């Protein structure tokens, strides 16, 4: 079995092959996200504690958190699930994944060091890989350098050096996202003002429409009353003429 061990503090990662099955037997029957002492891996691993973060079986199927079995299952996966990347919007697919319990059928087991031991592991804890890119979001730059809201974030951006042969060295800085500038505040004020204007205009239009509707309803009511009165006059006139004719006979 191979062990893919990473140490987030230094940014290093190392793949080691374990020939003796007895050394990795401590990881058997353990679930993903379980913290295990790594003393059984060798003398140099004394005091180290690792967390099981995943793995792949001999056919390459990945372990999935929450699937409480040793074997393989076929699950209907969609966007947001691990072990699946949708190619189309709303696409779902039935994929084979391995359970989250470790056993001897794994080819690679992924481990993360959560506690460093007494000795250094060459290529893992003794060297540091610098991060290629710094934070881009304004709030994360503030968090990294412990800045207050009053401090100017633009002065603390991590710049990337671009050194080319025959050209003078220059640096490149990322565009800071979510940076609050006077222009952003002006845009926000304009948005709020436009929203207020729209609501005021909608209120005025609604009031005008209600007034016009009331006027039209009043006109229709008066017209209806006139028609009713006209019908009554005609019916009374007919009744009086028929009465006079009958009296003459």
From Swiss-Prot:
Question: PROSITE patterns, per this entry?
Answer: RIBOSOMAL_S6E
Give a short account of its post-translational modification: Ribosomal protein S6 is the major substrate of protein kinases in eukaryote ribosomes. The phosphorylation is stimulated by growth factors, tumor promoting agents, and mitogens. It is dephosphorylated at growth arrest.
What GO biological process, any one, is recorded here?
cytoplasmic translation
Q: Which Pfam families match?
A: Ribosomal_S6e (PF01092)
Its subcellular locations are:
Cytoplasm; Nucleus, Nucleolus
Superkingdom to which the source organism belongs? Eukaryota
Mind listing the UniProt keywords for this protein, alphabetically? Cytoplasm, Nucleus, Phosphoprotein, Ribonucleoprotein, Ribosomal protein
Principal location listed in the UniProt entry: cytoplasm
Composition-biased stretches, type Low complexity, lie in 236-249
Q: Which InterPro entries match?
A: Ribosomal_eS6, Ribosomal_eS6-like, Ribosomal_eS6_CS
Q: Where is this region: Disordered?
A: 216-249
UniProt family annotation: Belongs to the eukaryotic ribosomal protein eS6 family.
Specify the protein name: Small ribosomal subunit protein eS6
State the species of origin.
Answer: Gallus gallus (Chicken)
